[in-house]
Amino acid sequence: MLVTETLGAFGFNEQILSSVIDARARLLTADAVIIPRSIDLDLVPVDDASIYERRVNWWNEKPYGFDLSPLAVFASNIVFVGSVGSASFLAQPARVIAADLTTIATADVSGRAQFTTTRGGLLHGFAGWFRAKLADGIELSNEAPGSHWEHVFLPLQTPVHVEERTPIDVELESHDGLSWRWKGKIGEVPFDQMSALSSPPCRL
C-alpha cells in the first residue's frame, strides 16, 4: 500500500505524479493499493477583478511612484493560489485533466476543456482545483471555499469581455506540476501563457 498527501493547490504541484510513478515501479506489487487512486483537475472561467487587481494589475499602478508595469507580463504567467468564489464563475466548471495514479506512466500530462459562458462579463482568467479519489465513494477536493489549499488562479495577460454563450476552448499542460501552460481561444481571441515565462530572463 502507498499513501501520499503530496497534494498541492492544483493537485500536481508537489510532484505527486513522478513520486508515485517511481514508488510504484520500485516498491509496490502489481495489485498494491494507492491512495489517492486518482486525481482530476477542474477549471472554470472567472470574472474576478479583485484577485486580478491584487495579483497582476497591481504592477501597473506605479506603487510609491515607481513604474513597474513591465513586470505585469511576468505576473500574468504565474499560477497564483487564492480563493475564488462561485459568484465569479462565467460558466459551469469542467474537467480538464484526469490522472489515474495506478496506471499513469508519465508526469507530463495535458488535457482540454470547453465552456460556454452562462452570462456576460470580463474574463480575467481561470480558477482551478483538484479532486482526489481516495477509495470508492470517498473523495478529497478543494473545490469548496475554506480549505487551506484554497484554489489556483491562472490569469490572462489581458482580460477579455465575453457575452452570454461565448465559446471558450482551453488546453492545459503540466510538467510534473513544476511548470504549467494554459492556451486556447475565448470566442475568436487566442491566448497562450505559461509559468516558464513568469520570471525575467537572466544572462550569465
Language-model features and meaning:
Residues 1-204:
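Class I SAM-binding transferase module
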